[in-house]
Swiss-Prot record:
Source organism of this protein record: Cereibacter sphaeroides (strain ATCC 17025 / ATH 2.4.3) (Rhodobacter sphaeroides)
Database matches in HAMAP family: Shikimate_DH_AroE (MF_00222)
Lineage top rank: taxon: Bacteria
Record keyword Zinc present: no
Enzyme class label: oxidoreductase
Catalytic function, reaction form: shikimate + NADP(+) = 3-dehydroshikimate + NADPH + H(+)
Binding site for NADP(+): D83, G134, A135, G136, G137, A138, L223, G246
Subunit structure: Homodimer.
Similarity field: Belongs to the shikimate dehydrogenase family.
Molecular function terms from GO: NADP binding; shikimate 3-dehydrogenase (NADP+) activity
Function: Involved in the biosynthesis of the chorismate, which leads to the biosynthesis of aromatic amino acids. Catalyzes the reversible NADPH linked reduction of 3-dehydroshikimate (DHSA) to yield shikimate (SA).
Protein name stated in the entry: Shikimate dehydrogenase (NADP(+))
Length: 279
C-alpha cells in the first residue's frame, strides 16, 4: 500500500483499557467529519510497552493516547518531549513521526483550561488564589495550567503530605502546601477550586471535605466524571458556586491529538458530549 493510500491508525494504550471513553470519542469524530481512519484501544502490560511502541509505526499507527499506568513511563521512551510534558512528568499524546522518532506531549492541562473557559466563560483565574486537592499526575497538569493562566497562588492539599511537598519543589513558590486536615480551611477567598483526587468516583471513598469557607464566587470543578455530578459538585452548587464536571476536560484534551493524527481540529460541543455519554 502506498503512503498516500494508507488509512491512518491511532489508539489508546493502557492497562486496564476497557473503561476508556476515548475510542467512542474518536470514533464519533471520525464519523462526524467523514474521515478515513481507525482508533483502537490496546491493553498493554508495562513489560511490553517498549516493544509495542516500537511496533506500532510499522503497523500503520500515526500516534496514540496514553493512559494509566504508562503516562510517566513513556516520557523515558520518547525521542522528543515537549516542555510541558517534561514539567508535568507525564505524556498522554504520542505522535509517531515519519523520521521514526516518537514525539510526546501532555494535553491534560490545555484540556482543563479549555473546559473551564467553555463552561464557565466568566472565569477569572488571575483574580484570586486557587485550591487544588490531590498531588498525582492530574494535579501536576492542572497546576502547570493554572500557573500558565496567571493564578497568583495555588493552595495544595493532599492526603500524602510528602507527595504535595515534592510537587511544590518542582513548581516553586506559587504553590503552598497544607495538610489534608486543612483541606476545607484553605478555601477562603479562592475563586478556582479543583479536585484531582479519585475521591467521589464510583467505587472509591466519597469526597468529604467541609465547604463552609467556600465563596459563592468560586468556580468548582471535579476531574472525576463517573458520576458526572459528584458530591463535591452538588454541595458547591448548593453553596451558589458555578460548577464544571470533568467530562469536558477529557473531550478537550483529546482534540489536539486527533488533529495531528487525522488532519481536522474537532469541535467539542453538546453533540460530542452526548455521543460519548451515550456509550
Amino acid at each position: 500500500m502506498t503512503e498516500h493510500m494508507r488509512i491512518p491508525l491511532a489508539g489508546v494504550i493502557g492497562s486496564p483499557i476497557a473503561h476508556s471513553r476515548s475510542p467512542a470519542l474518536h470514533g464519533y469524530w471520525l464519523k462526524r467529519y467523514g474521515l478515513k481512519g481507525h482508533y483502537i484501544p490496546m491493553d498493554v502490560a508495562q513489560a511490553d510497552l517498549r516493544e509495542v511502541l516500537a511496533a506500532m509505526p510499522r503497523m500503520g499507527f500515526v500516534g496514540c493516547n496514553v493512559t494509566i499506568p504508562h503516562k510517566e513511563t513513556v516520557i523515558a521512551l520518547a525521542d522528543i518531549v515537549t516542555d510541558r510534558a517534561a514539567l508535568i512528568g507525564a505524556a498522554n499524546t504520542l505522535i509517531f513521526r515519519k523520521d521514526g522518532k516518537i514525539h510526546a506531549d501532555n494535553t491534560d492541562g490545555a484540556g482543563f483550561t479549555a473546559n473551564l473557559r467553555q463552561n464557565a466563560p466568566d472565569w477569572q483565574p488571575q483574580a484570586a488564589p486557587a485550591v487544588v486537592w490531590g498531588a498525582g499526575g492530574a494535579a501536576r497538569a492542572v497546576i502547570a495550567a493554572l500557573i500558565e493562566v496567571g493564578v497568583p497562588e495555588i493552595r495544595l492539599s493532599n492526603r500524602s503530605r510528602a507527595r504535595a511537598d515534592a510537587l511544590r519543589s518542582d513548581f516553586g513558590a506559587k504553590v503552598q502546601v497544607f495538610d489534608w486536615v486543612q483541606a476545607g480551611n484553605i478555601l477562603e477567598d479562592a475563586t478556582t477550586v479543583v479536585n484531582t483526587t479519585s475521591l467521589g468516583m464510583i467505587g472509591k471513598p466519597d469526597f468529604r471535605v467541609p465547604l463552609d469557607a467556600l465563596s459563592p464566587k468560586a468556580v468548582v470543578t471535579d476531574l472525576v466524571y463517573t458520576p458526572l455530578r459528584t458530591r463535591l459538585l452538588a454541595e458547591a452548587e448548593a453553596a451558589g458556586c458555578r460548577t464544571v464536571d470533568g467530562l469536558g476536560m477529557l473531550l478537550h484534551q483529546a482534540a489536539p491529538g486527533f488533529e495531528r493524527w487525522f488532519g481536522v481540529r474537532p469541535e467539542v460541543d453538546e453533540d460530542t458530549r452526548a455521543a460519548v455519554l451515550a456509550t
